[in-house]
Each structure stands twice: as structure tokens, then as C-alpha cells.
Amino acid sequence: MKLDKDNLRQDPFAVLRIRDFSIFMLMRFFLILGVQIQVVIVGIQIYNLTPGSTGEKALAMGFIGLAEAIPFILIAIFAGHVADRINRKKIILFSIAFLLLASWTLFYISFNKIYLASLGTFPIYGIIFCTGIARGFLAPTFPAYQSQLIPRVLYANAATWNGNIWQTASVVGPAIGGLLMGFGNISVAYAVSASLVTFSFLIILPITNVPVPKNEIKEKLSNSLTAGFRFVFKNQIMLSALSLDLFAVLLGGAVAMLPIFAHEVLKLGANADMAVGFMRAAPAVGSIIMGIFLAYYPPTKKAGRNLYIAVTGFGICMIAFALSTNIYLTLVILMLSGSFDMVSIIIRTTIMQLTTPDNMRGRVAAVNGIFIGSSNEIGQMESGLAARLIGLIPSVIFGGCMTVLVVSGIMYLAPKLRKLNLDQIT
């Protein structure tokens, strides 16, 4: 006997009982775990290899984000078109294979130090550029493929568990990366990261091949490429939600500067590299705690109000983070920022899943990726540049204040989002 919608909504584990979705989540866990370890290692490596002042190191670390954001933005719209036309599982496999190659190349050039000794940090930036291409294809394909594995009524439940998986990997990954850098060496750390990405490639193989939804309307390529933007910009609720997250991530990208905070603000000395891993993991710890709570009490009722509160709370956390000089207080603040971010992620993801037609999911997800995915990397660049121009701590305080100001503006300009109740849509 089939469960009705109310019973499905009330079961916090409903979506995990679907075999293909569970395998998909396991694959994402190991992929994110490997990538998060790599993120920590690359940040520390660039910091250590860059000579000069704090400002110069901050700018060099900001370039990591720019190196990944440029190909991501350039490829995302075309990737969204491809995700609505070609078997999505195949796209995921090819993209992970590309990430896998990049991860093992990072291991090779770090193990064979002759390349970094002669070319400096340029090979690292080049490899990160390549990962941006792979991410450009994965960003629209992941949510589009996920929606084909589950019934519509479970989209909010899936968003919660998807967030929990992401954040769990984001806790364990940086912590492992920090420990490997603290007790081992960089080559071992890269080898572990690359092995996890390889494992994720193998895990996805048994998942069912689901055909791409047919598009009954034949479109010109130019119209198809811009369809995602047209859809988003006509939808006030989705546009407002994406804009909130865009500015929060863009202006609150202080996490990219954690190696500098560990060394020069918190002054952790020999323990700084290990602390970077735990600081990277702290927001995800907060997200996991909030995610478990939201699995039982979804934020879908009065979703608009909850979204505004969450983004405001995130901005305030960034201000407090900049002012903290104690590692334990810093970890607590970062955990709080992660818990607010989790609320925002679940609401935004559910809005996108519920309001997007099946045959446009790839293209709309591509727009979401440009708004949110690339803003992480551009925010990293903005943080590095702002730190160089006005100082590290003032730049983070400014970003937090601007986040709160943007929330106030969008609350006034987007009444539909303010009144949104997602339970009425599902």
C-alpha cells in the first residue's frame, strides 16, 4: 500500500529508503569528502608557497577562487543545456573522471617537487582551473538527476538529507585534511583526497540509468541556452532567494582567509595548519546539527520569513568571527554560521526543485550554480582583494554588515518571498 503525502512528509527517513537515492548520496559523500580535503591542502599550500606580506598572501589565496570561478561561469550555461539533452548519469561520470585526473595530478606535482620549484604556484592554479570545468558540468547535473530518483513530495526531505551529507563530508574532510597536514605530509594528503574521488566514481556505477525528460518544444540553441535565465528572472520568489544567497556568500566569503586568521589573528603557531582544518569543519558541524533538527521540523512553513532570519544570522556571525581573538569562540561562531546557512540551503533548494519543470532542471540549476556555486569562489577573490585594500578584519566586518543590509533591501522589494509558505506548493 502506498503511503500518502502527509505520511511521507512526516517520515524524516522516507527518501533514504529509495535505493538509487541512497547510493547517489553515498557517492556525493565520498566525492565531497575528497574535494574538501583538497580545498584545505591547496589553501595551506598556496599560503606557504607565497612570499611577502599578509595582503599578498590573502590575494594569492583569493586567486584560488578566481581560477575555479572563471571556467565554472563560462561553461555553466552550456552545461545546463547539455544536462537537459544528454544522459545525466554519463555527464556525472565524465565530470568525476575529470576531477579524478586533476586530483592525482596535484598529488604528482607535490610529490615531484621539481615542478613547483621551477614554476611556483602556477601549476596549482592551472589544475584548479580544470576542476572548475568539471564543477561547471556537475552543478546543473546533480540536482537535475537527483529529482529523477525521487517522488516530488520528498523534494524537501531530499534537500535536508542532501544538505546533511554535504555538511558531514564538509566536517570530516577539512578535519582529515588538517590532521594530514599536521602529522603527515602534503603528498599523503593529496593521495587520500584523490583516492576518495576515485571511490566516488566507482560507487555511482550501479545507479539506474534514467532517461532525460523529453522536451516537446523544439528550441533554437540560443533560446535553449538562455531559457534558464528567462525562467529565473520571471519568478520573483526564486530570483529573490538566489539573490539573498548570492550576496551572503559573495560578501561573507571570509572562510577562504582561515589560514591567515589561524596564523596571524589567532596566533596558533605550530598548531595553525591543524586548526585550519577544524575551523573549516566548524560551519559544517553547525549545519549537521541544524540539518538533523530540520529533518523532523522542516523550515517549509513560513519559509520566506525563515530564509530572511537565516541570512541575517549568517551576516551577524561573520561580523562576530572577525572580532574574535579566541580559537574556541571562533569555532562556536563558525558553527552558528553553518546552522544558519543550512536553513537557507534547504529553503532555496526546495524552492528550485518544486517550481522548475522537469525538462528545464539542468538549465535552471546552471543559473543557480552561477548565482551560488561561482559566488563562493568569487567571494574568495573578493575577500582576498578587500583584505589587501582595507585590511583583513575590516574587510570581514564590512562583508557581514553589507549582508545584513542586502537582506533588508530584498525583504522590502520581494513581498512574495516574504509571504512564502512552501507547504502550500508541495
Feature map (PLM): residue ranges:
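Hydrophobic alpha-helical transmembrane segments
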Residues: 118-132, 157-213, 274-277, 281-286, ...
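Short amphipathic alpha-helical coupling elements at transmembrane boundaries
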Residues: 14, 147, 160-163, 223, ...
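Helix-loop boundary and gating motifs at the non-cytosolic
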Residues: 6-70, 230, 234-283
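Helix-boundary and loop/linker segments of multi-pass membrane transporters
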Residues: 13-18, 113-118, 216-217, 229-235, ...
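Flexible cytoplasmic inter-helical loops of multi-pass small-molecule transporters
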Residues: 1-9, 205-227, 422-426
